[in-house]
Amino acid sequence: MVENGSRVVMEARDIRSALERLAREIVEQPVDPNGLALVGIHTGGVFLAKRLETLISKKLKHSIPVGTLDITLYRDDWTRLHTQPVVRATNLPFPMDDRDVVLVDDVLYTGRTIRAALDALIDYGRPKRVQVAALVDRGHRELPICGQFIGIELKTRSDEQVNVLLKEKDGVDRVVIEQAAQARKA
């Protein structure tokens, strides 16, 4: 569906279905469910990690820990984005050592966000394994990073922006592709 020059590629039901599949894939992997933890990257990844935890906990019949990770000061571009970085809280209420961690983000793009998240995560301990879950993989990698759990792969152009709208912050669940200049004005 096209609205105001933007293309809607996922609606609420599509996002729900993708998250249910991701939860199933995470649970089906060979891992000790007691050593599994989800870490959401601020901001969209935090909401998605919490949703995944709800789905995974139902499947495992017990809760798994969820943390939040701020990567602002680990980014290689923060000085280009803001003169004063906005730093959010990192909350990892579990030991990181020997843990199977799934880093959760809304969009996997160049790989730079995941690289920054790995740097930040390692400052908190030595996980046994780190995997990546993203609702959208839009390609265009600049670093050798890949996602293990992907909701949807989209073919995009570099002049487009993928916006993941989530009901927790935007009041609606939707994934939209827009022209980059259009997205900046919004």
Curated annotation (Swiss-Prot):
Pfam families xref list: Pribosyltran (PF00156)
Reactions that this protein is recorded to catalyse: UMP + diphosphate = 5-phospho-alpha-D-ribose 1-diphosphate + uracil
GO MF term (any one): uracil phosphoribosyltransferase activity
Short sequence motif named PRPP-binding, residue ranges: 101-113
Record InterPro entries: PRibTrfase_dom, PRTase-like, PyrR, PyrR_bifunctional
Record GO biological process: regulation of DNA-templated transcription
UniProt keywords, alphabetically: Glycosyltransferase, Transcription, Transcription regulation, Transferase
Enzyme Commission number(s) of this protein: 2.4.2.9
Top-tier EC class: transferase
Keyword Transcription regulation (UniProt): yes
Protein family per UniProt: Belongs to the purine/pyrimidine phosphoribosyltransferase family. PyrR subfamily.
PANTHER family in UniProt: BIFUNCTIONAL PROTEIN PYRR
Described function: Regulates the transcription of the pyrimidine nucleotide (pyr) operon in response to exogenous pyrimidines. Also displays a weak uracil phosphoribosyltransferase activity which is not physiologically significant.
Record protein name field: Bifunctional protein PyrR
Species of the source: Syntrophobacter fumaroxidans (strain DSM 10017 / MPOB)
